[in-house]
Amino acid sequence: MSKFFRRRKFCKFTAEGVKEIDYKDLNTLRQYLTENGKIVPSRVTGTKSKYQRQLATAVKRSRFLALIPYTDNHDV
């Protein structure tokens, strides 16, 4: 018997019944980015592959339109 109980991951988008991920929904997109600006993998978040692909496309679109930065702020 193990000491730790690992909670089962679930896809938030499937649970909420989302059809498509919007690139303008910055609050949702930021939940799936690290503090450095990288996209968090689906094995960590539990997102299904269909929504992970949509998420990656939405993040890349919003980066291109300068809605979110490509990386964190650098001190040069």
Swiss-Prot record:
Pfam families referenced in this protein's UniProt entry, alphabetically: Ribosomal_S18 (PF01084)
InterPro entries referenced in this protein's UniProt entry, alphabetically: Ribosomal_bS18 (IPR001648), Ribosomal_bS18_CS (IPR018275), Ribosomal_bS18_sf (IPR036870)
GO cellular component: cytosolic small ribosomal subunit
GO molecular function: small ribosomal subunit rRNA binding; structural constituent of ribosome
UniProt KW keywords: Ribonucleoprotein, Ribosomal protein, RNA-binding, rRNA-binding
Transcription listed as a keyword: no
TM ranges: none
Record-level GO BP terms: translation
SUPFAM superfamilies per record: Ribosomal protein S18
Family: Belongs to the bacterial ribosomal protein bS18 family.
Function of the protein: Binds as a heterodimer with protein bS6 to the central domain of the 16S rRNA, where it helps stabilize the platform of the 30S subunit.
Self-association state and partner proteins as the record states: Part of the 30S ribosomal subunit. Forms a tight heterodimer with protein bS6.
PANTHER family reported in the protein's UniProt record: 30S RIBOSOMAL PROTEIN S18, SMALL RIBOSOMAL SUBUNIT PROTEIN BS18M
Protein name per Swiss-Prot or TrEMBL: Small ribosomal subunit protein bS18
Organism: Xanthomonas oryzae pv. oryzae (strain KACC10331 / KXO85)
